[in-house]
Regions:
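Conserved catalytic cores and adjacent C-terminal regulatory segments
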Residues: 1-143
Length: 143
């Protein structure tokens, strides 16, 4: 499906700035694919959108890891940061020098948590390992 939609388009073909989190499993570190919107971001422009999409979506147990050339094997971006909007805001303020004042930057964040993975109220906060055994998995997968 990604191939049909994006073909051979690359990050460099995008008209808007993007920052896409993933984990370079070969290097054991986070990696953020970026458009070349600052002089120091010259490495990722050549990557195909299909490869970047498969890399950032490679959630363990759901989708396979994805290899991009000789650069490495990549895993789900949510492993390095499940709120990419915060990375974008950080980038805007620290790299693009957007002022840190109300209204200077906007972030649209669409949550994915399921109701079953949420906790309300102050009772039962010290669950212990037996309760967390199931709850932790639900929390990590849905947040």
């Amino acid at each position: 499906m990604l191939q049909e939609r994006f073909g051979d388009l690359t990050i460099g073909d995008l008209k808007r700035r993007v920052l896409i989190p993933t984990v370079n499993y070969s290097k054991g570190s986070g990696h953020f694919f970026k458009t070349p919107h600052a002089p120091l971001f010259y490495l990722d422009y050549k990557h195909r959108l299909v490869d970047v999409g498969l890399a950032t979506a490679a959630a363990p147990t759901y989708f396979p890891l994805h290899q991009i050339g000789e650069e490495g094997v990549y895993a789900d971006g949510g492993l390095v940061g499940n709120s990419p909007g915060l990375f974008g805001l950080h980038e805007a303020q620290h790299v693009l020098k957007v002022p840190r004042k109300p209204g200077s930057a906007r972030v649209l964040a669409i949550g994915t948590m399921t109701l079953g993975a949420t906790k309300r109220g102050a009772s039962g906060l010290d669950w212990g390992i037996l309760h967390w055994r199931k709850a932790l998995s639900d929390l990590v997968i849905s947040s």
